[in-house]
Amino acid sequence: MADVTPSRTGQVSRKTNETAVSVALDVEGTGSSKIVTGVGFFDHMLDQLSRHSLIDMDIKAEGDLHVDDHHTVEDTGIAIGQALAKALGDRRGITRYASIDLAMDETMTRAAVDVSGRPFLVWNVAFTAPKIGTFDTELVREFFQALAQHAGITLHVQNIYGANNHHIAETCFKSVARVLRTATEIDPRQAGRVPSTKGTLA
């Protein structure tokens, strides 16, 4: 039988006076990634996002890292969100909703998503240190704010407990990856319909 899986890919190039970011992703991927942002910890987190969502990601970012990591992280979130929105199109046939409680050693983080076309972030995550290595922990929220806004998704992230800041950050990325994987999957019972009584997710 022929493969009838729809092509769901998105590409975005974004250039400002502060950054140049290119993103190509495939929602129907296997979680392979090629990521270079110049921010080592951020690259590690994006690899987790790709691997556990099964969304293939090719990301290249060049930013004003001599200032700090903020613009690079935020603009990468914007570009990933825009590419995801392009890949999902009118969101016809998707599962739409997903949630998970994700454990990593001593840490537990909850994520829930509605791939609704309505951007919103509820963030209930507190770090106990301002940095993980050289990476500002406040940038984790900035990334997900940019992603949610430009992907057009409602995203809730709550760290239930945890002691290690690396683990807290990593469970945020992994839990969001897992809910994106589920919510963006095609539900055959939807029969190609938009999963909304309004008939549109926009």
UniProtKB/Swiss-Prot annotation:
<dbReference type="GO" id="GO:0004424">
    <property type="term" value="F:imidazoleglycerol-phosphate dehydratase activity"/>
</dbReference>
<dbReference type="InterPro" id="IPR020565">
    <property type="entry name" value="ImidazoleglycerP_deHydtase_CS"/>
</dbReference>
<keyword id="KW-0456">Lyase</keyword>
<dbReference type="InterPro" id="IPR000807">
    <property type="entry name" value="ImidazoleglycerolP_deHydtase"/>
</dbReference>
<keyword id="KW-0963">Cytoplasm</keyword>
<dbReference type="GO" id="GO:0000105">
    <property type="term" value="P:L-histidine biosynthetic process"/>
</dbReference>
<keyword id="KW-0028">Amino-acid biosynthesis</keyword>
<comment type="similarity">
    <text>Belongs to the imidazoleglycerol-phosphate dehydratase family.</text>
</comment>
<dbReference type="GO" id="GO:0005737">
    <property type="term" value="C:cytoplasm"/>
</dbReference>
<dbReference type="InterPro" id="IPR038494">
    <property type="entry name" value="IGPD_sf"/>
</dbReference>
<dbReference type="Pfam" id="PF00475">
    <property type="entry name" value="IGPD"/>
</dbReference>
<comment type="pathway">
    <text>Amino-acid biosynthesis; L-histidine biosynthesis; L-histidine from 5-phospho-alpha-D-ribose 1-diphosphate: step 6/9.</text>
</comment>
<dbReference type="InterPro" id="IPR020568">
    <property type="entry name" value="Ribosomal_Su5_D2-typ_SF"/>
</dbReference>
<protein>
    <recommendedName>
        <fullName>Imidazoleglycerol-phosphate dehydratase</fullName>
        <ecNumber>4.2.1.19</ecNumber>
    </recommendedName>
</protein>
<keyword id="KW-0368">Histidine biosynthesis</keyword>
